[in-house]
Amino acid sequence: KPDLVFSGVKYFNFNNKKVWLNDCLDTHGIPYIASSRAALFNESDKNLAKKLVLKAKIKSADFFITNPEDHQNESSMPISFPLFVKPITGGDSRGVDSSSIVFDFLSFKKKVLEIKTQHNLASLVETYLPGKEYSVGIFEDSIKGTLQAMPIEIIVKKNINGHRILDFDAKKNDEEKVIAVKDKQLFKKLSILAKKAFKALGGKSLGRIDIKMNDLGVPHFMEANFMPGLRKGYFYRSCVLNLGMNYEDMIFNITNTGLSSKEFSKINIRKI
């Protein structure tokens, strides 16, 4: 039986049945990094995630879920333009591009249809937030039960329409710039929101909370990732900029957290 499972897989599909890996590991008493099946389900469904954080009194942009046939005119829409349109589920900003910000009904219908046609998904439509963008890495101390927040700011260049959008191409081509959050008051605000969102969604061990500012500079929850990539992406960079960790240190920290989180004795892991 393994001491600890590192996995970037949430579930498998067998004969049209979805089998969640962490459910199987829990059944057999095998510790693993990251969150339970329930928490992974909460964050992967962006509609559910926003409902849960709003219920916890955490700010998030007004939103609704739609399919191409749902709204036949602008008056039937529950919130007004400008809006941001993205797939209801999925990572890496898939389905997000320069046309995701919509200012009129025709552009809205076109983007919703595109998401349905290309990704076979409903759209999550929310009030567009024009402010700065942040991501907050979260480390849990499983013994003390405390959370450590590690905010970073993500800066992308303006697109042809003059908007800064962290879209699929920007992530794929590594075009964004990541910097530390040095303003102490802002650091505190981002950390508080991220910790509250992590708890509201049932997170464990580690994760990432994405946040964006509105036009008044008020932070709003955007989405969560409870199975962040362990290569040199945003989670790793949040560790570097906030804790001065190198890659090896980050992996050992995650390993010890994963082992202790299931009430297994913490082991002394030697660096090779």
Model region roles, listed by residue range:
Residues 1-62:
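Conserved N-proximal alpha/beta basic substrate-recognition cap immediately N-terminal to
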Residues 40-124, 130, 142:
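Active-site nucleotide/adenylate-binding loops and adjacent lid/helix of ATP-dependent enzymes
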Residues 2, 77-80, 214-220:
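A short, glycine/Asx- and small/polar-enriched loop/turn
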Residues 105-192, 213-220:
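Phosphate-binding site of ATP-dependent enzymes
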Residues 54, 184-272:
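ATP-dependent carboxylate activation and anion-phosphoryl transfer catalytic cores
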Residues 5, 32, 63, 85, ...:
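Generic preference for hydrophobic
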